[in-house]
């Protein structure tokens, strides 16, 4: 992995997504198929009904194509790369299935929660098996704990795929946060590029940054297209996989602090309502609470991006200093 291949990776994934996205938007508009809006959501979100979704279809395609040709050129086609591509594509397909039900059946809910959870768990199990023979290390230690860590991997990937999915409720929020998150892991990988598997991880992060940069102009407010579950599930699972393969699992709790807070707000809201009959927030995930408090989408986006950026800087700096 050198400077030229890094630049071409970002440029390739960016251009494929940026140049082809208008055609995908035009296709979905012609089909009159778009996002269905939750009835219990903010009333002003109703105007977003019909906005094309499944933008993840193109930015995942762009990332995969770019990763494969650069990896073939640089001799980086390894098990590490296949593991990352597996997570990206399979979780994307799970989301695509869910999005298709919503779009073509004109409903906001996709397939049943247990069906989605089962697919996510099975995919995470396959990822675990792929790397089982190499052994695992905890992010802040060297103790190998076998099957117990395997369960942790499944929980980590499924958990963060859903956390990013919950966060994807405002125009541009997740695409902006994800660029920051992948950039943080790119820096960690580049600093340790001599470590086995790190060049492949760097390539993966570069491609994801490029493709999301190409997607962002069409996704920020007012969004011309949403990434859909296809995009958000794939991004969340991929970030979890990257953190695992870098052996800095716990760093995702900091780098992905916004995803964690969004998920925690939902859990706390449900727990509070079930036990006391009272709600802690006006609406969850928490970005809706701020909407209901009078914040504009742009204000929420910018504040959340800044929180994500500061958290990423803290996490990366700590890892580089402490190791």
Curated annotation (Swiss-Prot):
Catalysed reactions, semicolon-separated: UDP-N-acetyl-alpha-D-muramoyl-L-alanyl-gamma-D-glutamyl-L-lysyl-D-alanyl-D-alanine + di-trans,octa-cis-undecaprenyl phosphate = Mur2Ac(oyl-L-Ala-gamma-D-Glu-L-Lys-D-Ala-D-Ala)-di-trans,octa-cis-undecaprenyl diphosphate + UMP
Topology term for the membrane: Multi-pass membrane protein
Gene Ontology CC entries for this record: plasma membrane
HAMAP family in UniProt: MraY (MF_00038)
Family: Belongs to the glycosyltransferase 4 family. MraY subfamily.
NCBIfam families, per the entry: mraY
Protein name: Phospho-N-acetylmuramoyl-pentapeptide-transferase
Source species of the chain: Limosilactobacillus reuteri (strain DSM 20016) (Lactobacillus reuteri)
């Amino acid at each position: 992995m050198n400077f030229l291949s890094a630049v071409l990776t970002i440029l390739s994934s960016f251009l494929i997504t940026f140049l082809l996205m208008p055609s995908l938007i035009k296709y979905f508009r012609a089909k009159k198929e778009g996002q269905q809006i939750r009835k219990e959501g903010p009333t002003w979100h109703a105007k977003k009904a019909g906005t094309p979704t499944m933008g993840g279809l193109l930015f995942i395609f762009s990332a995969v194509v770019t990763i494969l040709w650069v990896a073939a050129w640089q001799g980086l086609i390894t098990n590490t790369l296949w593991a990352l591509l597996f997570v990206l594509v399979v979780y994307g397909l799970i989301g695509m299935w869910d999005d298709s039900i919503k779009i073509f059946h004109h409903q906001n809910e996709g397939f049943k929660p247990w069906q989605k959870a089962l697919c996510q768990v099975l995919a995470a199990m396959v990822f675990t098996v792929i790397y089982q023979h190499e052994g695992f290390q905890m992010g802040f230690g060297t103790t190998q704990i076998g099957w117990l860590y395997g369960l942790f991997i499944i929980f980590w990937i499924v958990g963060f795929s859903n956390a990013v999915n919950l966060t994807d409720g405002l125009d541009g929020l997740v695409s902006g946060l994800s660029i920051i998150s992948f950039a943080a892991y790119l820096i960690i990988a580049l600093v340790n590029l001599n470590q086995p598997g790190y060049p492949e991880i760097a390539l993966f992060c570069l491609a994801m940054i490029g493709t999301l940069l190409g997607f962002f102009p069409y996704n920020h407010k007012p969004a011309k297209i949403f990434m859909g579950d296809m995009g958000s599930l794939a991004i969340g699972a991929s970030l979890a996989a990257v953190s695992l393969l870098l052996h800095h699992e716990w760093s995702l709790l900091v780098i992905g602090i916004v995803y964690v807070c969004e998920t925690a707000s939902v859990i706390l809201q449900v727990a509070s309502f079930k036990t006391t009959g009272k709600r802690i927030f006006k609406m969850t995930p928490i970005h809706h609470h701020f909407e209901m408090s009078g914040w504009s989408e742009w204000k929420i986006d910018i504040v959340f991006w800044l929180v994500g950026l500061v958290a990423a800087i803290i996490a990366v700096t700590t890892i580089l200093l402490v190791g």
